[in-house]
Amino acid sequence: MRKLILTAAVLALATPAAAQSTGTPVFAAPYRAFRASELGLSLSDPGSGVALEGFYKVGQKTWDLGVRGGFWDTDGAGTAVLLGVDGRTRAVTHSESFPLDGAFTLGAGAVLHDNANLFMVPVGLSLGRRVDLEGSTVSFVPYFQPVLTPVFGSGNSDMLFSIGLGADIRVQRDLDLRVSGALGDMDGISISAAFLH
């Protein structure tokens, strides 16, 4: 009976969380921040509990490909394992007629918890523009990212829509700080640090 209650609680908590491949409110700016690769950590509040994830991304021609993994402490319902892969490719370049740059995003991931496993395939478009601060090496990218996410597994399926709002802040040549939040079928906030190579 206890496993059934925990399974139901995890499904209820995890179903709305579908921003990126692991269901946390970590979103992507339309730009590649790194030259060759990046390694980082994300701490997020996906609506219930706290999630901690590590990530690694590389650039492959026009695509950025990454893996992420971590844990989500779901406020009394146990700890879920988070696993995902993400991709991003540039789709729009700003012009006189359209002021934003854009990137197509695609992911696949899982929230694994005892018998309550959820799988996600988020598809989105990130739109934003880099702002360089005059006389400084600091720059930032404010962006928004609508995401449509099919969610399935453990007898549960849904189609979720959310909008991520975020800013990537380049504080040094090899360090990005990132903040994002979600609106829509999910909510939550995240902060990340990425070490750029």
Task: Provide a role label for each language-model segment.
Residues 7-8, 88-90:
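Generic detector of short alpha-helix boundary/capping microenvironments
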Residues 84-86:
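Extracytoplasmic beta-rich ectodomain segments of secreted or membrane-anchored proteins
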Residues 1-33:
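Cleavable N-terminal export/targeting peptides
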Residues 79-81:
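Phosphate/oxyanion-binding active-site loops and adjacent basic polyanion-contact surfaces
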